[in-house]
């Protein structure tokens, strides 16, 4: 494949559109709440308590938000590691989505930390616990965010005509691409390992030695789903041709990963002797909802004709994305009982608004970047 076969161009157009202004308003509301959180403490802006070490700011903004950021991971794996050049038009939009997903997930951690001013301690060897899986996740996420900045840098350099530096960067970019595949593989699986450690505090419907595998599979699946979702939405909102031919090929991989996940999930329950929990346990409804969404999404992709229809692709990607979201939410929050006693947790309106604001900021920045920087491939690329 040749990376020069596709030309990228800014989409142009007004930035101050209605969607952007709505997102900006949501970000402003979240900003006011965050000011209250940092001046008055966690209790002023959340329902977190001594019985629950984290809430939706970790479960959604970080654990789920980082999976949204796996679009760049899966496309880099396909395009550069497996040398599937047909996916190259999807690279820059996917890397941009990853940059925002991981960058904002990293910042969201600082919102949840009680002593956020000590966050840099993980970088100091005399404070670090080398056997901690949480340390590995933190270092990997921070490093991968920097890697994504470097991977997206060619778009900035191209936009401002800094061709000399861009040419030099291209010579060493393969190192960062390799890191961009290695690091998410490490920390996405380690997000599962973190919950293996909690033992009986996690419902037997989800507690398993296979958690690292399941988290890696959902990261890959959600990465594919985000690529499809983002591509279809961009085509609709920016009046661009649908990228159905390349998305059709991607959908076959989504089908394979989703099918593997479902088979392994049920096999794991059978091997552990917990299959009866799916109808009788206290959280069985959440498990059934998670699996129903996953199975519905993959069944929709089985007919080959559906893989060539943008509506079916979008619906399937949406179902699989929500299934991945629910699986991670089940593991990190719904199926997790961290303390014995009269402790309960349900997110406050302020917590929810902060989370909404984080995703609104991601959308607003995406709108600015695709309009001002060469992110999207030209509708009629030149071949040479």
Q: What is each stretch, according to the model?
A:
Residues 1-71, 75, 363:
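N-terminal signal-anchor module of multipass membrane proteins
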Residues 308-384:
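TerminUS-proximal long segments
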Residues 23-43, 107-111, 182-192, 366, ...:
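Alpha-helical transmembrane segments of multi-pass membrane proteins
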Residues 21-30, 98-106, 315-324:
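Hydrophobic alpha-helical membrane-insertion segments
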Residues 6-15, 20-30, 86, 124-306, ...:
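Long, contiguous internal "core" modules enriched in hydrophobic/ aromatic residues
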Residues 52-117:
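Membrane helical hairpin/interfacial module
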Residues 103-104, 184-186, 261-264, 320-329:
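Aromatic-anchored segments of alpha-helical transmembrane domains
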Residues 2-6, 78-95, 117-127, 376-380:
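Flexible loop linkers connecting adjacent transmembrane helices
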């Amino acid at each position: 494949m040749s990376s020069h076969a596709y030309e990228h161009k800014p989409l142009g157009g007004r930035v101050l559109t209605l969607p952007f202004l709505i997102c900006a308003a949501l970000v402003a509301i979240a900003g006011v709440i965050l000011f209250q959180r940092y001046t008055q403490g966690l209790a002023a802006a959340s329902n977190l308590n001594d019985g629950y070490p984290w809430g939706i700011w970790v479960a959604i903004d970080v654990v789920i938000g980082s999976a949204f950021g796996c679009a760049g991971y899966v496309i880099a794996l396909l395009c550069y590691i497996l040398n599937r050049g047909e996916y190259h038009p999807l690279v820059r939009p996917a890397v941009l989505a990853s940059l925002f997903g991981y960058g904002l997930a990293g910042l969201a951690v600082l919102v949840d930390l009680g002593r956020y001013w000590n966050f840099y301690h993980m970088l100091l060897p005399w404070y670090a616990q080398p056997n901690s899986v949480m340390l590995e996740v933190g270092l990997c996420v921070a490093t991968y965010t920097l890697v994504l900045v470097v991977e997206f840098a060619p778009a900035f350099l191209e936009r401002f005509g800094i061709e000399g530096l861009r040419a030099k960067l291209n010579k060493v970019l393969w190192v960062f691409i390799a890191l961009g595949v290695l690091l998410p593989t490490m920390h996405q699986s380690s997000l599962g390992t973190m919950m293996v450690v909690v033992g009986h505090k996690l419902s037997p419907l989800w507690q398993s030695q296979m958690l690292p595998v399941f988290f890696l599979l959902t990261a890959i699946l959600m990465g594919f789903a985000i690529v499809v979702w983002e591509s279809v939405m961009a085509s609709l909102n920016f009046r661009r041709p649908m990228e159905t031919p390349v998305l059709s090929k991607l959908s076959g991989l989504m089908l394979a990963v989703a099918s593997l996940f479902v088979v392994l999930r049920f096999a794991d329950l059978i091997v552990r002797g917990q299959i009866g929990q799916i109808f009788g346990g206290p959280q069985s409804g959440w498990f059934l909802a998670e699996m129903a969404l996953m199975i519905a999404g993959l069944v929709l992709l089985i007919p080959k004709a559906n893989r060539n229809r943008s509506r079916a692709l979008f619906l399937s990607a949406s179902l699989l994305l929500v299934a991945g979201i629910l699986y991670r939410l089940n593991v990190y929050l719904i199926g997790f009982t961290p303390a014995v006693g009269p402790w309960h947790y349900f997110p406050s309106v302020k917590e929810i608004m902060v989370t909404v604001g984080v995703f609104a900021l991601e959308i607003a920045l995406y709108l600015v970047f695709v309009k001002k920087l060469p992110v999207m491939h030209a509708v009629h690329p030149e071949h040479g």
